[in-house]
């Protein structure tokens, strides 16, 4: 017989119920609702960095210690996405991983087959051991672990939802399998020295998703029984300690509930298996689970605390070697009570029989050790936060300075660098780099230091541009009323940006903004409304339609085939209406006896093909969805047809090159129909309706902005569009020799950039939230990729998220043409605005508290950070979409009273040819 209890660990990715007389029903808070971080916390006792979820699954071993690595040998069965991580990260030959093929992870079918595979192969191992002496001897050693990764319920929950009959049937399969494996091990060993732990790496929401940090996704079961595990604590006739509203309907009020953290499970497993605690474990051994006496518990608690203190000691020594003036953690410094003294005191308590006091002292020492680890982790945070904040502020200032230099002054003022400025910036950067070199800081620190110095040095070099730009932009503000109006507008702009920050948490904020924005045309007076009544009504209705989506739950809950078909039908209807009313649309939505241009039959035929592809996408999607709902899997023909429709539809714009129709409204329709089939295939609910409403808002916005730009009697527009103050002689000369084909930006254009920014946020938050990025439904991608493939499926989901942004980039590109501004001008303004949000979210990031708070704040910051890069990328997308597009002649020539440089360009060309001047104003 072995002298140590054997350990069997069952991991399952859903909340599970299992109550027996010898089982202690407990619940555990998970650190993460994602697979990899959850398994690392469970098996290694370490809370891996959140970014680890992006490191992949199959070929990224866990590069730190684990319970498996500390065991004499571990046998594991289950998913090819999880087991290889721990097999490759352990001592060679210590972990055996038996995995099924990835083709079994089919989300279009019931997932219980995955669990049956695991149970069957465990039975085969023990059956072989009865005839294989070598294997039999290996199985009877001490400190061995059996790890059964049961993925079936997770797969079934994703595909059919946790309250489906398929899910309940899968629970029965797991119930029976657990019973059979338990009896199998009891019969094989016949010594009652096996411990069992049943738990999960994450929970699951009612709609079959996880990953967003919601309590439903981070609360998981922890059920332990067998050798070394304490019996349940019963409280007959009363509510036992530990219960709350969450467990009120379990009908287990008489049994005490014990809550632990996810990393604590690794410590529990190590103790039950008789192994050392993993070297990186930060878990606290849950003593309430153990049958051991007080002396054994006291000794185990001390060993647990010493492991944490050893981690602190090693990390502190490393920090001392790289810091010029190291500031020690006060509770563990020499000035305080020395660690050695506290450990010796605890040992003395154990030797004198004061076990309970020793346990309390060990727990307190462990908390101090965790505090020390936290202190070292955040040692440089204040300095880094200050440095990064200066960098973000420098970027905002640099972006705005560049906008003024290129798109207000058209580059007529050159940067002015001084020796003092160069010396100051160089000295600052040298001092920072020297400090980093001495401290052996990561390479990222050098980037943190470089960008603030670079940005602010560039801003200083362009100080004359800022001075001249202020005159150009604010020169018309001379009266107190104009100044008050400016301050009011600035306050409104700041308020809208702050409301967008709240919109990351409360999507309903966008509803309020759209309702307010629906009345925007009224601000230009009744004369404007009379001239553009139809356009104003269209804008109003589309804004009201958009306001409804953020009142609905994120479109990741349940699949609604009828809603999908309605969205697809309306997309088809939009295309048909265009073909019928093409002359009306291309005549700027006005009737004329003679069409503005002859009909392009090739182009109309291609539009018809795109309409057909959208209809086909809807029909194939309906067939696939119904087949999978009936548990019949994804028909191969449907999968092939879905891919054909998706690829062909995205390539359709290339066909228009044969005989293009370059009218801007036709181009918008082509882009709309290009993305429509993809959106239909990848939608599960009301996203198709959003796609139509969002497109209507964008088209209305482009036309409305142009109408306001041309409207002569709008006081706001008149102030913004009035000609700039007379240029200085040298500036005029520069402008004439280096003319720009675009007009300079004015204060009015800040509103256009703000509208773009609001619509940019709505493109994402109207159908989802930050949580929906990681907590997504697989219903849509399973119509194309039914087999689990995180990278391919993730790419499909990202494609779906990007489609609305492609629409808005194309529409902004067209609006730039209609307003006569440079293509990059408004994009650069938005890039500056976006980092105001980034800086806000940077300072509210949390790494303590609930996983919901931690995950949400980090996600907010990451998304806001990527906005800047994303906006820059959209400029290139916009240029591609609107290449060769034509707007009406009156728009291209709408320079009116403004000093648009296109007139100067014509004048320069005329003078070059020796002709008369063009007479530009």
From Swiss-Prot:
Localization terms from the record: Endoplasmic reticulum membrane
A GO CC annotation given for this chain: endoplasmic reticulum membrane
Superkingdom, taxonomy of origin: Eukaryota
Coiled coil segments of this chain: none
Keywords: Cell wall biogenesis/degradation, Endoplasmic reticulum, Glycoprotein, GPI-anchor biosynthesis, Membrane, Transferase, Transmembrane, Transmembrane helix
Region (Disordered): 715-737
Pathway: Glycolipid biosynthesis; glycosylphosphatidylinositol-anchor biosynthesis
InterPro entries found in the cross-reference section: Alkaline_phosphatase_core_sf, GPI_EtnP_transferase_1, GPI_EtnP_transferase_1_C, Phosphodiest/P_Trfase, PIGN_N
CDD domains (UniProt xref): GPI_EPT_1
Membrane-crossing residue ranges in chain numbering: 37-57, 386-406, 418-438, 441-461, 483-503, 509-529, 533-553, 561-581, 606-626, 640-660, 679-699, 752-772, 795-815, 825-845, 862-882
Membrane-topology descriptor: Multi-pass membrane protein
Main location: endoplasmic reticulum
Glycan attachment sites: 69, 132
Gene3D superfamilies (alphabetical): Alkaline Phosphatase, subunit A (3.40.720.10)
GO molecular function: mannose-ethanolamine phosphotransferase activity
Keyword Transcription regulation in record: no
Known EC number: 2.-.-.-
GO terms, biological process: cell wall organization; GPI anchor biosynthetic process
Role description: Ethanolamine phosphate transferase involved in glycosylphosphatidylinositol-anchor biosynthesis. Transfers ethanolamine phosphate to the first alpha-1,4-linked mannose of the glycosylphosphatidylinositol precursor of GPI-anchor.
Similarity annotation: Belongs to the PIGG/PIGN/PIGO family. PIGN subfamily.
Name of the protein in question: GPI ethanolamine phosphate transferase 1
């Amino acid at each position: 017989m072995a002298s140590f209890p054997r350990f069997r660990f069952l991991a399952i990715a859903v909340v599970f119920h299992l109550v027996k007389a010898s089982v202690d029903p407990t619940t555990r808070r998970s650190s993460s609702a994602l697979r990899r971080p959850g398994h690392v916390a469970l098996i290694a006792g370490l809370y891996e960095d959140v970014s680890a979820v992006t490191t992949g699954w199959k070929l990224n071993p866990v590069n730190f210690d684990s319970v498996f690595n500390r065991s004499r040998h571990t046998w594991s069965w289950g998913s090819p996405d999880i087991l290889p991580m721990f097999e490759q990260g352990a001592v060679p030959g210590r972990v055996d991983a038996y995995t099924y093929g990835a083709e079994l992870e089919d989300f279009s079918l019931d997932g219980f087959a995955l669990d049956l595979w695991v149970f069957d192969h465990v039975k085969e191992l023990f059956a072989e051991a009865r005839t294989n002496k070598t294997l039999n001897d290996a199985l009877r050693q001490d400190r061995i672990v059996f790890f059964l990764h049961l993925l079936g319920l997770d797969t079934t929950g994703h595909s059919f939802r946790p309250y489906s009959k398929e899910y309940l049937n899968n629970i029965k399969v797991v119930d029976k399998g657990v019973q059979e494996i338990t009896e199998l091990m009891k019969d094989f060993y016949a010594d009652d020295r096996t411990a069992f732990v049943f738990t999960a790496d994450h929970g699951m929401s009612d709609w079959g998703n996880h990953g967003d940090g919601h309590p439903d996704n981070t609360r998981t079961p922890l059920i332990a029984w067998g050798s070394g595990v304490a019996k349940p604590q019963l409280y007959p006739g009363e509510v036992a300690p530990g219960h709350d509203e969450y467990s009120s309907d379990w009908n287990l009020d008489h049994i005490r509930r014990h809550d632990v953290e996810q990393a604590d499970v690794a410590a529990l497993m190590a103790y039950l298996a008789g192994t050392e605690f993993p070297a990186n474990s930060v878990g606290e051994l849950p003593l309430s689970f153990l049958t051991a006496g007080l002396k054994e518990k006291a000794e185990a608690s001390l060993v647990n605390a010493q492991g944490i203190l050893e981690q602190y000691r090693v990390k502190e020594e490393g920090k001392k070697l790289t810091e010029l003036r190291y500031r020690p953690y006060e509770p563990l410094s020499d000035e305080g009570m020395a660690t050695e003294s506290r450990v010796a005191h605890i040992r003395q308590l154990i030797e004198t029989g004061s076990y309970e006091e020793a346990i309390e002292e060990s727990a307190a020492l462990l908390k101090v050790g965790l505090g020390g680890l936290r202190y070292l982790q955040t040692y440089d945070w204040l300095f880094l936060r200050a440095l990064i904040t200066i960098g973000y502020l420098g970027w905002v200032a640099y972006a705005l300075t560049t906008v003024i230099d290129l798109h207000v002054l058209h580059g007529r003022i050159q940067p002015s660098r001084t020796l003092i400025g160069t010396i100051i910036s160089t000295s600052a950067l040298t001092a920072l780099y020297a400090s980093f070199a001495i401290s052996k800081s990561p390479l990222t620190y050098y980037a943190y230091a470089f960008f603030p110095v670079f940005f602010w040095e560039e801003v200083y070099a362009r100080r004359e541009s800022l001075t001249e730009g202020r005159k150009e932009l604010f020169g018309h503000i001379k009266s107190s009323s104009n100044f008050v109006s400016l301050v009011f507008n600035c306050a409104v702009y700041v308020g809208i940006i702050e409301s967008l920050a709240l919109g990351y948490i409360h999507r309903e904020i966008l509803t309020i903004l759209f309702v307010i924005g629906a009345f925007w045309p009224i601000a230009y007076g009744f004369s404007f409304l009379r001239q553009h009544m139809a356009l104003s009504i269209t804008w109003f209705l589309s804004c009201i339609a958009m306001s409804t989506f953020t009142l609905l739950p994120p479109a990741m809950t349940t699949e609604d085939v009828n809603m999908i078909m309605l969205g697809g039908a309306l997309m088809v209807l939009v295309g048909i209406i265009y073909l019928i009313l093409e002359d009306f649309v291309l005549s700027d939505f006005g009737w004329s006896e003679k069409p503005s241009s002859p009909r392009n039959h090739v182009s109309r035929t291609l539009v018809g093909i795109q309409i057909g592809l959208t209809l086909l996408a809807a029909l194939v999607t309906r067939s696939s969805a119904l087949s999978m709902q009936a548990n019949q899997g994804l028909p191969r023909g449907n999968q092939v047809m879905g891919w054909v429709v998706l690829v062909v539809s995205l390539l359709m714009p290339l066909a228009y090159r044969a005989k293009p129709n370059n009218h801007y409204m036709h181009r918008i329709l082509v882009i709309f129909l290009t993305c429509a089939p993809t959106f239909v295939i990848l939608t599960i609910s009301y996203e198709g309706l959003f796609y139509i409403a969002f497109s209507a808002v964008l088209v209305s916005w482009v036309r409305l902005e142009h109408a306001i730009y041309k409207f002569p009697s709008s006081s706001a527009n008149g102030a913004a569009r009035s000609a700039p103050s007379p240029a200085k002689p040298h500036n005029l000369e520069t402008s004439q020799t280096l003319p720009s084909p675009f007009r300079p930006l004015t204060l009015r254009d800040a509103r256009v950039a703000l509208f773009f920014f609001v619509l940019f946020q709505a493109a994402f938050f109207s159908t989802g939230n930050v949580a929906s990025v990681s907590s997504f439904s697989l219903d849509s991608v399973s119509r194309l990729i039914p087999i689990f493939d995180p990278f391919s499926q993730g790419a499909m989901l990202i494609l779906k998220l990007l489609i609305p942004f492609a629409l808005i980039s194309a529409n902004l590109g067209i609006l730039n043409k209609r307003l006569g501004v440079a293509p990059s001008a408004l994009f650069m303004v938005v890039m500056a605005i976006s980092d105001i949000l980034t800086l806000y979210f940077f300072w509210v990031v949390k790494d303590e508290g609930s996983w919901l708070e931690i995950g949400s704040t980090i996600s907010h910051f990451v998304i806001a950070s990527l906005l800047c890069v994303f906006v820059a990328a959209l400029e290139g997308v916009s240029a591609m979409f609107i290449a060769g597009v034509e707007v009406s002649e009156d728009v291209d020539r709408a320079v009116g009273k403004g000093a648009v440089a296109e007139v100067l360009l014509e004048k320069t060309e005329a003078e070059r040819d020796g002709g008369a001047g063009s007479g530009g104003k």
